[in-house]
A protein has these predicted regions:
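Extracytoplasmic beta-strand/coil segments of soluble accessory domains associated
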Residues: 85-124, 151
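N-terminal periplasmic accessory domains that precede
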Residues: 84-87, 104-107, 119, 134-135, ...
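Outer-membrane beta-barrel signature, preferentially recognizing the C-terminal barrel domain
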Residues: 310-327, 505, 511-518, 564, ...
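N-terminal periplasmic "start-of-domain" segments of outer-membrane beta-barrel proteins
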Residues: 44-77, 105, 113, 123
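Transmembrane beta-barrel wall of Gram-negative outer-membrane proteins
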Residues: 192-294, 315, 319-343, 571-573
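Short acidic/polar hinge/loop motifs at secondary-structure boundaries
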Residues: 96, 123-151, 202
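C-terminal beta-signal and adjacent terminal beta-strands/loops
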Residues: 713, 765-770, 791-845
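Gram-negative outer-membrane beta-barrel transporters
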Residues: 649-651, 663, 668-770, 842
Length: 845
């Protein structure tokens, strides 16, 4: 198996030892208290919000019919989480993937992003990205009342959940009778660059025995600086490193996630209800990129580590761009009894939008450059000419403007029916769902000249700000400075630059997809003396159609429509065995199917009859099919306490990765004879996918054993050891993208005297990011860690109002995120962003 070179920093070794010392200390403390006075059975009950949230989450887990981890709303409020990825990343076996430090994707039990399905209040949400991949940075944490992270799925859950199914429960008017509300305001600073941090949220509801209404809104906004050293290509020789190219960036980022929603309910006298629910979420990211690229490949007789390039070349790129992801959900539903049945009907309209627009002027230059790459992670490059005086030469960039852009809109309509009843064995449930999706998108890099928009290279230099050196506390390898990118963008727009429409997309990048999924299921819960058994069967029928291009006899592009249909029977079985009142065993066998993403399976492609090749989408991809086994032991040994260990195994066939395969060339061009095999480069099916691991979870509190000031201490610890593998189309064996061998979370908290303090540490080992066809060794992210501190003070005793003041301190370790190719000697991206601090107040009534 191709694996990254082992490289554990002293900081990580110290963190691992610290975790071990913490566990040892906790064990000794409990042993001492028990030996001296025995376990205290009667304690004084006091208001402890961390304890209340732990009780809520643990009891929900304990009473579930399947293997699940639960996050309560109170627990979310006790951590400095700004989106759902951060909140879920604290659960056992759940890891976070970040972009510029922001939690964005989830690797659920070490699985690729697309193996996790997501729902709001039981309504399945297609992936904002590629139709399959959830973007969790689009969903603020404050909109949720509870999160159910299902690790072993039942038949009433979507079959797409290979690794897990995350059901996000939002607030309902009937949660609290009468008028209720809450608000949150926080402000702070990002220490690198001094950017502002602002948080706002509010919720208001009313309900009685006839109707209920609820409205909410939230916004979190951050101004951030990111320093990024990437794409440093080097050759390792005896005596050191010879650099060839390097790109260094400094980003000024202004990003926000927003959410708003409303619910109206009318209650029937018979016990049913009819309701309408609306949810709108948006992630918006404005980004200024200041980039220098240096090319040293023309050096004659280069020397390792240090040297001089008399004729180095490169370019400078200046961008003011935007990324936007939105999710809009409208649901009309009703719940009502019919005879002995409880019936639920939902009709949902869902619209997803994902787009980016990056207009990018870039100018070429040539100059002498002295280099020092003795430390490849902190290189230094010195130009002969001061950067402010460096002239941009059209010889080195004839094309000096490119308009990068892309957009995908997905419309989804769902009809969902569920009904359950009691029978002689226990409970029986059945249901059906019709799911229709339409996706339309495209992307391009439209090249041009600044002169087309009324700008010269000299005019661009007028926007430079040499006195504004890059904000950085780590590296500025060239002494870079900022440019007024926003002013330059405004000038480009005034000159006619626009966000293009799909008619300007590259033909080989168009995404046109229609998909229909019909699902039926039935499940029987059998109640027994020892617990319960749940047997289920789900059937999913998929019709997939995509439109792309083929060549006619004259070599012109004409539409090509490819349709695929497949059906999947997905059985499942769950056993819950209560050993006694405190301990429980669980065992599950599940099956699932992961469909190709829209971009992967699009029919559009570039066609080359001369090379007998096709590059682009692969509409002939097979869906990934899996079966899995879960075993779990849960010990609820004290109030708000748990020790749990679980083991899991997943076998996945037809693993989809970037790569090459062969197709019938005559489908794409009459130049090929029927059956003639051409090479298709894009996505392909691998084989022999396997994912297995062990998870540990421990939560305990000293107030289960003692009273007094020290009884306020407690710990939350979880750990996952995971291994995965698959065989790529080229025959090489890799770990599955997203698998870290080791992940863990450690939290030490104290709550007493209206104060709650929580120190949290998160760690994940290195993991494979991509298996791009042109990168034989794969791209990996190196190990990552985060240290966070949360402080809360309850004001109710002082003021009579339910309110707290809080402080959140994030990324206190100021950790660098590093990506590399093949092994850690070849870093291709090093990101730093600094710590973040927020103060705020939260109140409710």
């Amino acid at each position: 198996m191709t694996e990254p070179t082992a490289c554990r920093s002293p900081k990580s070794t110290f963190s691992t030892l610290s975790l071990g010392v913490l566990v040892l200390f906790w064990s000794l403390t409990i042993s001492t208290v028990t030996a001296e006075g025995g376990i205290i059975e009667e304690v004084i009950v006091v208001a402890k919000p961390i304890k209340a949230s732990q009780l809520s989450s643990i009891e929900a887990k304990r009473n579930s019919v399947n293997l699940v981890d639960v996050v309560s709303a109170d627990a979310i409020g006790r951590f400095p989480d700004t989106n759902l990825a951060d909140s879920l990343g604290r659960l056992p076996g759940v890891s976070v993937e970040r972009d510029q430090g922001r939690a964005r994707y989830l690797n659920f039990r070490g699985a690729p992003r697309r193996y996790t399905a997501i729902a709001f209040d039981g309504i399945d949400i297609p992936g904002t990205e590629n139709g399959r991949i959830p973007r969790f940075d689009s969903y603020p944490s404050v909109i949720t009342s509870q999160i159910l992270a299902n690790k072993a799925i039942t038949a009433d859950m979507t079959g797409e959940a290979v690794a897990g199914y995350i059901d996000i429960r939002t607030f309902s008017p009937s949660d609290i009778e009468g008028i209720s509300g809450s608000f949150d305001y926080g402000f702070g600073e990002q220490d690198l660059g001094g950017g502002d941090v602002d948080r706002y949220s509010g919720r208001l509801s009313f309900s009685n025995d006839r109707f209920g209404v609820l409205v909410f809104a939230s916004e979190t906004r951050n101004e951030q600086v990111t320093t990024n050293l990437d794409d440093m290509d080097s050759t390792y020789v005896d005596g050191g490193v010879i650099p060839s190219t390097i790109r260094t960036n400094n980003y000024l980022v202004d990003y926000s996630n927003e959410a708003s929603g409303a619910t109206g309910e009318f209650y029937f006298g018979s016990g049913g209800r009819i309701f309408y629910k609306y949810l709108d979420t948006e992630f918006l990211d404005f980004e200024e990129r200041n980039q220098w690229q240096i090319d040293l490949r023309g050096i004659e007789n280069p020397t390792p580590n240090t040297g001089y390039a008399p004729d180095a070349r490169g370019n400078r790129a200046l961008e003011y761009g935007k990324y936007n992801n939105t999710t809009e959900v409208h649901t009309l539903g009703t719940d009502f009894p019919v005879a002995n049945w409880k019936v639920e009907v939902r009709v949902s309209d869902i619209e997803l939008k994902s787009e980016y627009w990056l207009p990018l002027p870039y100018m070429g230059w040539s100059d002498g450059v002295t280099y020092d790459v003795t430390d490849p992670s902190d290189p230094v490059f010195t130009f002969d000419t001061p950067l402010a005086d460096l002239q941009y030469d059209p010889i080195f960039s004839v094309i000096d403007f490119v308009n990068f852009w892309g957009r995908t809109n997905t419309e989804n309509q769902q009809f969902k029916f569920d009904a359950d009843t009691s029978n002689a064995l226990g409970a029986f449930k059945l249901g059906a769902k019709f799911d229709q999706r339409e996706a339309l998108g495209g992307s391009a890099a439209n090249y041009g000249l600044l002169a087309q928009y009324g700008l010269s290279r000299e005019a661009v230099k007028g926007y430079e700000q040499p006195d504004r050196l890059w904000f950085t506390d780590v590296r500025n390898p060239i002494g870079g400075f900022y440019t007024d990118n926003k002013g330059l963008f405004d000038a480009l727009v005034a000159g006619g630059v626009v966000f293009p429409g799909l008619e300007d997309a590259d033909s080989d990048g168009l995404v046109t997809v229609d998909e229909e999924i019909v699902s039926l299921y039935a499940m029987q819960t059998i109640f027994t003396d020892f617990g319960s058994v749940i047997l289920g069967l789900r059937f999913e029928d998929t019709d997939f159609r995509t439109v792309g291009w083929q060549l006619d006899a004259q070599g012109e592009e004409v539409p090509l429509t490819v349709s695929e249909s497949y059906s999947n029977w997905l059985p499942s079985a769950h056993v819950n065995y209560d050993l006694n009142e405190e301990t429980k065993l669980r065992a599950s066998i599940t099956t699932a199917v992961s469909r190709p993403g829209y971009n992967e399976a699009r029919a559009s492609a570039g066609i080359s009859p001369v090379n007998q090749s096709v590059s682009g989408g692969n509409p002939y991809l097979e869906p990934e099919e899996s079966w899995g086994l879960d075993l779990a032991y849960e010990w609820y040994f004290g109030e708000a306490s748990i020790f749990a260990v679980s083991a899991f195994y997943r076998e996945v066939d037809n693993v989809i990765v970037a790569g090459s395969t062969t197709v019938d060339g005559s489908v794409y061009s009459p130049a090929a004879q029927p059956g003639e095999q051409w090479t298709l480069t894009g996505s392909a099916n691998g084989r022999d996918g396997e994912l297995k691991g062990i998870e540990l979870n421990f939560i305990d509190r000293l107030d289960n054993y003692m009273t007094g000031p020290f009884s306020g201490f407690g710990v939350e610890l979880n750990l996952a050891a995971i291994d995965s593998s698959f065989t790529a189309p080229d025959g090489n064996e890799y770990s599955l993208p997203g698998t870290s061998d080791l992940t863990y979370n450690a939290s030490l908290f104290y709550e007493q005297y209206n104060v709650s303090i929580r120190l949290n540490y998160r760690y994940r080992d290195s993991w494979l990011d991509t298996t791009e066809a042109d990168v034989g060794d794969g791209n990996y992210w190196d190990e990552q860690e985060r240290v966070e501190l949360s402080l809360r003070y309850d004001l109710e005793e002082l003021t009579g109002y339910k309110a707290i003041v809080y402080a959140d301190l994030m990324n206190l370790s100021d950790y660098e995120d590093v990506r590399y190719t093949g092994n850690t000697r070849n870093p291709n991206q090093i990101e730093t962003y600094g710590s973040r601090y927020v103060l705020g107040i939260r109140a409710s009534f």
